[in-house]
Design a protein with these regions (language model features):
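Low-complexity, intrinsically disordered extramembrane tails and loops of integral membrane proteins
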Residues: 1-10, 182-192
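Cytoplasmic membrane-interface segments at the C-terminal ends of transmembrane helices
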Residues: 56-77, 170-188
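Hydrophobic, lipid-facing residues on alpha-helical transmembrane segments of integral membrane proteins
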Residues: 16-28, 32, 50, 54, ...
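Individual transmembrane alpha-helix segments
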Residues: 135-167
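Functional transmembrane-helix hotspots
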Residues: 91-131
């Protein structure tokens, strides 16, 4: 019986599936670190692309995709990048929703804002921080219009970090493909 090459039965390799879960964990770790522990949100945004690059590269290293094929290399990176990007975006929105709905107006100085818990307190907090003119220029006049603006901006940011992580996944896969091509000298000679 002649040995025949079997076609892959998956769109992505098992190693890429593992890498996708690693990407989920990485996104959660970055999110907890820079949205909760040390709340510096711009760092969270800036790390989306490098996180995607690393996970796209790792998806193919984990799958041992040295030498291609290019379609599979790119799909592995794309899948891992999408998983990382979705987690990145959903975690951002979940943490924003938590703080948006739970804001009771408490301030560091001890004096609370006079407001109803949730959107109204967040709106009053922005007004107290001197953002009234900028909000009015954006058409915000009350808690409801502030809520619409706030969530539109948060969805825009979540989309941005999703796109950055996903594009990073493709970029990482491309870098892996370029730097891990098989060469004739890499072939193993048959043994006698």
């Amino acid at each position: 019986m002649a040995a025949t090459a079997q076609r892959p039965r998956r769109f992505i390799d098992r190693g890429a599936i593992t890498a996708a879960w690693v990407g989920v964990g990485m996104a959660v770790t970055i999110g907890v670190s820079f949205l909760l522990v040390i709340p510096i949100e711009p760092i969270y945004w800036y790390l989306a692309l490098p996180a995607g690059l690393m996970i796209g590269y790792y998806a193919n290293a984990r799958s041992r995709r040295e030498g291609g094929p290019w379609g599979r290399v790119l799909l592995n990176g794309l899948a891992a990048g999408i998983a990382t990007g979705i987690t990145y975006a959903l975690l951002l929105l979940a943490i924003k929703a938590l703080f948006f709905t739970a804001d009771n107006g408490f301030r560091d100085g001890g004096q609370s804002l006079v407001c109803q818990t949730g959107a109204e307190c967040v709106y009053q907090r922005y007004l107290a921080a001197g953002q009234g003119e900028a909000l009015a220029a954006a058409g915000v006049t009350d808690g409801a219009s502030f809520t619409a603006l706030y969530w539109r901006e948060q969805l825009s940011t979540a989309t941005l970090v999703f796109v950055l992580a996903t594009a990073g996944g493709l970029g990482g896969a491309f870098l892996y493909g370029v730097t891990n091509r098989r060469r004739a000298t890499d072939e193993v000679a048959p043994t006698a």
